[in-house]
């Protein structure tokens, strides 16, 4: 499905948006002998299929299918275009331009909104995410994450959930990235950031590396369930305000004394931390 080259660090940006745009019953798209497209979990063609051919990648261009969007609506969809992600040095990530048929005016419309680079495409991922941001793996469901939202952005940062790096699966790294990018400290789906906020992301696998000589300060350490340690909030909330949101979860995981610590110390005390980030120190006026 997808990976990216390790990015030259300008700085990455945090995003409020999360929720995936499409869930659908998934196996593999297939093409039978009379050229009707189906999924292996969907309704088969009325014609007898003598041969089933797996269709993937660019061969999916033009495929139409029925599926369910994030609001539970059954809609008609079409894959208008498929291309390799130009940011993926391994050339294994496909970007899909997915349209849906709007019943209000019978017009085909792009499912995704354009991102900062004016790209309105999606990357498919197995499983689903609920309103809290929790991921449930399933071989029968895929989720299309738009390039303007965190599911796809974390893949393009290098955290491909189907990959293994240095013997470690990147599934949990991808999930931790979705929490970190949105400053979802409690792991309950609530964001504590603003669109376009610069952050410096790094990990011990070397997928993302800390930028030297930045004016940013260590903010938090992360795993798939949210923050494992909060040194200081990204924006104007105080640590006490965030603690009130999930007091039991963050007990002993917040910098209480006001002396800022480092990611290295957090890693020593909390070895289950996967990702770390720095951010700009902000003060209320």
Q: Where are the model-predicted features located?
A:
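Long, compositionally biased low-complexity segments
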Residues: 56, 61, 66-285
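Signal peptide processing junction and immediate N-terminal pro/mature segment
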Residues: 26-40
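Short, Lys/Arg-enriched N-terminal segments with co-localized hydrophobic residues
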Residues: 1-6
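Sec-dependent N-terminal signal peptides
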Residues: 7-29
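Aromatic-enriched hydrophobic runs in primary sequence
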Residues: 31, 49, 54-56, 60
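Eukaryotic low-complexity, mixed-charge intrinsically disordered interaction/regulatory segments enriched
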Residues: 37-54
């Amino acid at each position: 499905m997808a990976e990216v080259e390790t990015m030259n660090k300008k700085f990455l940006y945090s995003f409020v948006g999360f929720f995936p745009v499409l869930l659908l019953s998934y196996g593999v798209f297939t093409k039978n002998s009379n050229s009707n497209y189906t999924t292996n979990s969907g309704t088969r063609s009325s014609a007898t299929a003598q041969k089933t051919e797996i269709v993937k990648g660019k061969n999916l261009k033009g495929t139409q299918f029925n599926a369910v969007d994030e609001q539970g609506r059954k809609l008609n969809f079409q894959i208008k275009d498929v291309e390799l992600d130009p940011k993926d040095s391994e050339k294994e990530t496909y970007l899909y331009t997915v349209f849906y048929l709007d019943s209000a005016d019978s017009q085909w419309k792009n499912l995704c909104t354009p991102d900062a680079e004016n790209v309105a495409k999606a990357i498919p991922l197995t499983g689903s995410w609920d309103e809290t941001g929790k991921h449930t793996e399933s071989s029968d469901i895929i989720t299309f994450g738009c390039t303007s939202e965190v599911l796809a952005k974390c893949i393009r940062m290098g955290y491909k959930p189907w990959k293994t790096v240095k013997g470690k699966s990147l599934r949990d790294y991808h999930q931790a990235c979705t929490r970190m990018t949105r400053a979802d400290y409690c792991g309950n789906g609530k964001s504590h950031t603003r669109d376009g906020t610069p952050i410096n992301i790094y990990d011990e696998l070397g997928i993302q590396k800390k930028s030297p000589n930045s004016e940013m300060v260590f903010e938090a350490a992360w795993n798939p369930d949210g923050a494992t340690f909060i040194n200081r909030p990204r924006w104007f909330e105080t640590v006490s305000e965030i603690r009130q949101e999930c007091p039991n979860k963050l007990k002993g995981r917040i910098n209480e004394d006001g002396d800022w610590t480092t990611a290295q110390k957090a890693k020593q005390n909390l070895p289950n931390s996967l990702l770390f980030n720095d951010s700009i120190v902000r003060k209320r006026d």
